[in-house]
């Protein structure tokens, strides 16, 4: 079946790019992708029935390693369960590949089970979306052209995921398995384009920053080595550091103040991703009438300075 050939090509391409962790929530419609992963001995598989939790596991893996994990699920509401993790990945530019199975076009709008509109279901929260309508007949010239299209899409996906999540939606036809199946000459060659090393996920880059007066560092979502850099910087500046829950920075105690009671600093240096603490945002809002410089250094080294 051409469905299986395409799935095999996609998984082999991932492995060629060093992407070897697959977060699998198996279901009938994603059988081709499941079999493709199972056939690869070097694939590391994390399997669970809870798509929401599994998507967050893929997100956590990428945060810790800088490598995208591949989230694989069946069609319908299984896809929607990944939405929270996709949003977080988008907000923090965390790499993530989503391979979702779907019913073919002819089964949409017919009342077929678990057939929902999955086209661009994650909206602007993904860096790239492609709907892959696998050709039912793999012997045509059109099918050969579409296999070249698949190679191109995979190359684009590997590049785009360096900056956030990428969604490839696979419209698979039944039957998913055939006894004694023999792949024909239409098999897609795994993508080996020069797309760079997806594992090179940029760390927080600390440009030369001139700060004056009392400094307070606040640390958002970041990788472990970035948290160590922040601690070193705090030591160099001899200033306190506040760690958001997303930072992963370990603390020696776990007090949970209902409000901040801190001396007002001259400069607030925000490193890493966004801060989710409501108390923090309330405190910074209270500084509206104070002359405080806010410097934000993100993972991509885009620096913004504002006065609060």
Show which residues each predicted segment covers.
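Glycine-rich, acidic loop regions that bind phosphate or pyrophosphate groups
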Residues: 100-154, 243-308
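Thiamine diphosphate
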Residues: 31-106, 267, 276
